[in-house]
C-alpha cells in the first residue's frame, strides 16, 4: 500500500509542478513520508523549473522527462471513468458468478435445441421424398400467378433497358453537319434523326435482292465514279446503291416525297441489319456467343446498327440529290471532274439526259431548235414515259454546225431577227442538257440539241446542214 501511495504522491507533485511552471512560480520543497523510489522521482523537482530556460542546467532533459510523465497522466485520466465504472460493476460481477450454475443449465438446453434441429432436418428430407400434401397442392395455382408476375416484371425490365439504351444512344450520337438536310426539308432528309425499335414494326419490305436498274447499266460507270468522289472517304457507295437512289429521284410521289423516301431508306437500313444477322448465323460459334447476350443488349446492338446503316443511306441520298451527277456532265466541284475530258462528258450528258427529265421540272423542255435552210424551226420531240413520268427523250434528226470566233451569250427577253424571220426567246436557267459553262467551238456540234435558246452576238455565222 505504501508503494502505491508513493506513486500517487509523485504524480500529484508532477501535476502541481506543471501549474506552478506555467505561472512562473518556483516550487517549494515538500517533505513527505515516502519510500526511496518516490523520493528518487521527485528529488530534482524543487531545484529547477520544469519549463527551464537555456540558463538552467539539464533543462532540456527535464522537459523530456516531463513530457513522458504528462502523456502517462493524460492516458490515466482518460481511463479513470472506465475504471470507476468497473469498480461500480464489481457487485454485479459477483452476482453473475453466483448465477453461473444457471448458465451451465442453459448450455445444456442449447445442446438439446441443436439435436432437435437435426431431427427436424431429417424429417423435412423424408417429407420431400414422400407424396405432396393436399394443402400444398391447393397452393399450386398461386405459383402459376407468381410465374405470370415474373414474366411481366421481365418485360418491364426489358422495356426499361431498351429505353435506357435509346437514351444512351441519343446522348452519344452526333450527326454530321456536312450531310444534313439542305436548307429546307423538301431538299433533303435530315440526318439528325435517331431510329428506335418501333421502326422495326413497320414499313419493312422484305429481303428482295437489289440490282442495277436496266436503264442505268450502260451509263452508270462514269456517273458512279463521280458519285464516289462526291461522297468522299469511308462511305464507298456501290453501283447498286446509287442506282437505287437514282430511281428514287424519279418516283411519282408528289404528295409527300420526303416521307416516302425516308421510309424507303429505313427499310434499306433494316435490310442491311438482317443481312448481317444472317451472315452471323452461318458461323455456329459466333451465333452461340450472340445468343448468350441478354435480350436488352441484343436489342441495343441491333438498334445501334440500324442507325448506322440509316445514317449512311441518308448521307448518300442527300449528296446525290444535292449534286445530281446524273444531270451534269461534271460535278459542281471542279476537283471532282471526270478526268477533265469535256468532250466525252458532254456526249455522256446528252445520252443520259435523253432518258431523264429536266433539272427544273417546272420548265419542260419539249422542243428543240434545229436548223433548216437559213432559219430556225421549232420542232416537237417525241415523248416517252420513264417510271410514270412524261419526259422528253428523242434527239433532233439534224445537227447544226456553227463556226464562230465569238462565244455564245444567253438572251434576255427580247426578239432576235434572223433574216426575214424573228424568233421570240425567253431567258431561262440552264437546262439539264446544257452544262453550266460556256461551250467551246470544237464541241458545238454536240451541244446543238440544248433546250436553252442561244443567240449569236455577231453576224459572222454560217449555218450548214449536216
Swiss-Prot record:
Belongs to the RxLR effector family. Residues 109-121 have a biased composition (Basic residues). Residues 99-127, 384-405 are annotated as: Disordered. Secreted effector that partially suppresses the host cell death induced by cell death-inducing proteins. Residues 1-21 form the signal peptide. This is Secreted RxLR effector protein 101. It is found in: Secreted; Host nucleus. It comes from Plasmopara viticola. A motif (RxLR-dEER) lies at residues 48-63. One of its GO terms (cellular component) is host cell nucleus. Keywords: Host nucleus, Secreted, Signal, Virulence. The RxLR-dEER motif acts to carry the protein into the host cell cytoplasm through binding to cell surface phosphatidylinositol-3-phosphate. Residues 385-395 have a biased composition (Polar residues). The keyword Hydrolase does not apply. It comes from the Eukaryota.
